[in-house]
A protein has these predicted regions:
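Conserved alpha/beta core segments of nucleic-acid transaction machinery
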Residues: 152-158, 162-192
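P-loop NTPase catalytic phosphate-binding loop
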Residues: 1-37, 46-139, 162, 167-170, ...
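Flexible gly/pro/ser-rich segments immediately N-terminal to CXXCH heme-c attachment motifs
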Residues: 41
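Short polybasic amphipathic segments
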Residues: 145-151
């Protein structure tokens, strides 16, 4: 369940990203005071998972200044967020010049599902992988969920993810929401 959902309003996205940046900075101050380098499970700080679905949409807004701020905020969150418990996951259907290299290169894990061209595959995985035999454009069109995963400096590995229908996703969301509500009720002593 999302704590906050941002639709197609770039201004809302910027506000949320600024708030996450402030939270990240506060956590770094707390970590510094405790003499720690990163958030640990035993610290009791919840992870913030930031999912940006269709990254290119927010990076191609007609307002150049807004576009630039989204890119800068995301770059900071991706670069510094993980140690503070702020994890960014970004997806785009058509990788290209809309996603700045300075942002794209910060992602430690990259998954290239079937692409139309070797250049698109390289845009995701990094320059030169397609010519080295790691080309997501060679994945057959009927192989849903098959792609190449590049994980923190390793060679890309061919993987298969699960493909879920909208109905299956809805059932998972409903079940997870109910479990989260049950846990909250138990923790607060409230009754449903």
């Amino acid at each position: 369940m999302a704590e906050q959902l941002v639709g197609p309003e770039c201004e809302q996205a910027v506000e949320l990203l600024r708030a996450l940046q402030r939270e990240m900075d506060a956590r770094y101050r707390e970590l510094l005071a405790l003499g720690l380098r990163k958030v640990r499970r035993e610290d009791g700080l919840a992870l913030h998972l930031v999912v940006v679905d269709e990254l290119a949409f927010y990076l191609s807004d007609s307002d150049r200044k807004l576009r630039q701020e989204v890119a800068e905020l995301l770059r900071d969150l991706v670069a510094r967020g993980r140690a503070a418990g702020v994890i960014v996951v970004a997806a785009t259907q058509k990788p290209g010049a809309d996603v700045p290299t300075a942002l794209r290169d910060l992602f430690g894990f990259r998954l290239a599902l079937r692409c139309n061209t070797p250049q698109a595959s390289d845009t995701i995985l990094g320059q030169g992988w397609a010519s080295s035999g790691y080309d997501a454009s060679t994945v057959a069109g009927g192989q849903r969920g098959v792609g190449l995963l590049l994980a923190e400096g390793e060679r890309p590995a061919r993987i298969k993810t699960f493909h879920l229908s909208d109905a299956q996703i809805g059932a998972i969301v409903e079940r997870a929401g109910a479990r989260r509500a049950d846990a909250w009720l138990a923790a607060t002593g409230s009754e449903g």
